[in-house]
């Protein structure tokens, strides 16, 4: 019997199969091999002494250590233009990690009016990154997110205060209730639980990742310079005609330094100006 892990806690894993959710434990061989099953893993179950056990883990397309999950298809990078203002560097970092791991990043703009959203959109208009503006009053953007979820495993990522919980509640009003019920059963508060939980919705799956604002592939992983131009689609087609990998890494490093040095001077200015100018000069 096969299925995928929806949640793991306290050494137990909950696997969604054609027969429903099965509680199980992994075989000891995984501990010897230093392999830890995570949410999103496709696994094979067998029965030992009347109990289900994880006998095999299918090859992973990708795996992340924070939050612990595997086989992610889409990463929604949630940002707001007000309270807090967006960090272009954080969006660049997260999108680069996602692209390098074969995950499609999608920029989602919340808590913003049309004029402010256009500044953020302009920073990515020459890239291949999809951009979705959310308006809860009209429902704008919610159908676009549902479209991306269909047939895929998705997760939401972003700084505290950008509206991830509000967005999830707008998409899935029952998620908070389901998660609260699980936390109550385990005797834990909603925000002290940091386990990934996968829900099925809109023909796909959504990973609820409480307590995680960032994304980490591996503490030992890095993107080689040969892969930088592919990890930063913001550079557009120009990367193949005017830039090689070294130029990309140097240009981006210079951009980061300028951003850091001018942080104080630009607090009252348009927060997207440096990014737009830097991209135009490449």
Predicted segment positions?
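Short beta-strands and strand-coil junctions in structured, solvent-facing domains, enriched
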Residues: 12, 83-85, 155
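N-terminal low-complexity segments that are often proline-rich with Ser/Thr-Pro
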Residues: 246-282
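Structural detector for short beta-strands of small beta-barrel domains
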Residues: 1-9
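Helix-rich effector regions associated with P-loop NTPase G domains
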Residues: 11, 28, 34-51, 56-75, ...
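Charged helix-capping and loop-helix junction motifs
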Residues: 90-93
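A short macromolecule-binding patch
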Residues: 21-27
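A conserved segment at the C-terminal end of the G1
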Residues: 166-176
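Canonical P-loop GTPase G-domain recognition
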Residues: 114-162
């Amino acid at each position: 019997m096969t299925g995928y892990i929806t949640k793991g806690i306290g050494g137990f894993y909950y696997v969604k199969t054609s027969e429903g959710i099965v509680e199980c434990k992994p075989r000891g061989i995984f501990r010897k091999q230093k392999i830890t099953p995570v949410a999103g893993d496709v696994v094979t179950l067998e029965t030992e002494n009347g109990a289900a056990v994880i006998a095999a883990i299918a090859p992973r397309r990708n795996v992340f250590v924070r939050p612990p999950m595997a086989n992610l298809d889409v990463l929604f990078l949630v940002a707001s233009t007000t309270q807090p203002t967006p960090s272009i560097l954080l969006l660049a970092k997260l999108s680069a990690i996602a692209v390098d791991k074969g995950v499609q990043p999608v920029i989602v703009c919340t808590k913003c009016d049309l004029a402010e959203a256009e500044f953020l959109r302009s920073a990515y208009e020459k890239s291949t990154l999809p951009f979705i503006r959310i308006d809860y009053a009209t429902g704008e953007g919610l159908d676009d997110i549902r479209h991306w979820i269909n047939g895929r495993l998705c997760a939401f990522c972003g700084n505290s205060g950008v509206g991830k919980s509000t967005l999830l509640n707008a998409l899935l009003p029952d998620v908070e209730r389901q998660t609260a019920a699980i936390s109550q059963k385990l005797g834990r508060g909603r925000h002290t639980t940091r386990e990934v939980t996968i829900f099925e919705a809109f023909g796909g799956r959504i990973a609820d990742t409480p307590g995680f604002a960032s994304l980490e592939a591996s503490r030992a992983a890095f993107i080689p310079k040969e892969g930088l131009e592919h990890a930063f689609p913001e550079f557009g087609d120009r990367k193949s005609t005017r830039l090689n990998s070294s130029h990309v890494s140097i240009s981006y490093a210079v951009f980061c330094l300028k951003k850091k040095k001018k942080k104080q001077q630009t607090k009252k200015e348009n927060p997207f100006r440096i990014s737009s100018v830097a991209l135009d000069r490449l």
